[in-house]
Amino acid sequence: IKQEIDNASFPPILIPDTIAWENYKAVLNSNRFTTYFFNSLIVTGSATLFALLVGVPAGYGIARMQAHKSTIVILIARITPGLSYLIPLFLLFQWVGMLGTLWPQIIIHLVVTVPIVIWIMIGYFETTPMELEEAAVIDGATRWQVFRHVAFPIAKPGIAVAFILAIIFSWNNFVFGIVLASRGTRTLPVAVYNMISFDQLSWGPLAAAALIVTLPVLLLTVFAQRQIVAGLTDGAVKGG
């Protein structure tokens, strides 16, 4: 919100007299920034959707089968640094000719989002009551029907938490984008980084771009917080 001259003033100016809206206009009027914004939407949305489709049933199956060894595998996948498998996947994507598209980023984001979703859903399904599922089985429901009509509705608060965390981890990911993305498939964190140059650094547009990148996830968390807390509270009361 500061003019460029205010950023270097001494003593520092915390709140300027006039807000520099031109910083935001300069960022939003950039065609490349709009492209990067839609790239982030596609990558984050696809990675989150696929992670939920895989992670929720997987978490339910592991929790109900009490497959503790599988839980250890999920934990190892969760704590493994992304750089350890970035170079092998880069060579694989280069070999199959996928570089220059959004698919490499979507696939490698799944390596991050799927373990998060599975880990959260395992913990949530382990705390949900079994009585309703047992009653459905006695009534003749199949395992899939029990999951779809009984376990899934109860687990909606946990799914909401997994959904938000998957979005946050995918949206803010920087390393995968800067390595796998081409000029036309970069995401917003990479776009903000590319605004830093050796000869000149405009703090106003850079800060405006950083705020625009952070704002969607921040708003999503704020608006969904009440529903998540209310759902978790209801689930705890029913489970007790």
How would you describe each model-predicted region?
Residues 1-240:
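A hydrophobic, multi-pass inner-membrane permease signature
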